[in-house]
């Protein structure tokens, strides 16, 4: 390592990913700014894919934090999203072609009355335009090739679902969901349950595991790393990725028992 090379960083860089940028592209951007900023080479990965059309919290793991990235994939997430009623697209968002329409636009009262049916354990069919593999091929590749893609139902959990704002032909909801939940599918199914059709026009992740959108930095701030801005002002510590794990305080005897692999009978 040369005198000018800075030590490899370890921790979390929390990006506020803009719409249009893929998660893999975001990882590439962080690798570049670290290299240009003079940091030693280190592992970089993300803690949960965020679709290019979505925006918001994207945890980027650096160095030793990459060992915790898998846990972040399993963490619950919170999203704000807007459903526009009247049209369903093949991609279930604004990028696709309209495949079904409805003249029925549900009222806010009807929407509110329907949401409890989508709270708790549910089953949903993922979008055909998704990265799920079917017989070794990505579903979106099959869909783009014009093949009829049959998506199997999956179990997921919606911990909370609430209305944030209503507008003409649209509603914005906030959903706290378990891993593996597809917001586009949730929007489709809510619209269908209301006797309408719908697709997502806005999607923002506001929380991923313990990480909040208030902690996230813009791409402009990340780019400053390449120009010599201190990384330590932006980097969250390794343990920040564990902040949502329940803590159990033990007395010295119980702590010693745990270290020895013994079961604590009083718990």
Where are these regions (language model features)?
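Glycine/acidic-rich beta-strand-loop module
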Residues: 43-73, 141-144
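Extended alpha-helical targeting/anchoring segments
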Residues: 130, 134-153, 158-159
């Amino acid at each position: 390592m040369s005198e000018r090379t800075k030590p490899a960083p370890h921790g979390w860089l929390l990006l506020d990913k803009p719409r249009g940028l893929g998660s893999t592209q975001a990882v590439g951007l962080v690798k570049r700014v670290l290299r240009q900023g003079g940091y030693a080479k280190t592992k970089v990965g993300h803690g949960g894919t965020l679709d290019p059309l979505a925006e918001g919290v994207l945890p980027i793991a650096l160095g030793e934090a990459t060992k915790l990235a898998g846990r972040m994939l399993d963490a619950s997430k919170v999203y704000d999203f807007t459903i526009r009623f009247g049209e369903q697209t093949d991609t279930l968002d604004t990028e696709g072609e309209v495949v079904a329409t409805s003249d029925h636009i549900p009222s806010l009262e009807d929407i509110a009355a329907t949401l409890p049916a989508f709270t708790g354990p549910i089953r949903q069919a993922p979008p055909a335009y998704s990265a799920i593999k079917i017989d070794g091929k990505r579903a979106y590749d099959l869909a783009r090739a014009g093949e009829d893609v049959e998506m199997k139902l999956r179990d997921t959990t919606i911990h909370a679902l609430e209305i944030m704002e209503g507008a003409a032909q649209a509603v914005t909801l906030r959903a706290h969901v378990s891993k593996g939940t597809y917001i586009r599918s949730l929007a489709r199914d809510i619209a269908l349950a209301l006797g309408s059709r719908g697709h997502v026009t806005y999607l923002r992740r506001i929380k991923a595991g313990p990480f909040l959108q208030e902690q996230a930095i813009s791409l402009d701030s990340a780019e400053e790393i390449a120009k010599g801005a201190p990384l330590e002002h932006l980097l969250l510590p390794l343990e920040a990725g564990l902040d949502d794990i329940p803590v159990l305080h033990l007395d010295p005897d119980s702590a010693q028992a745990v270290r020895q692999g013994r079961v604590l009978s009083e718990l």
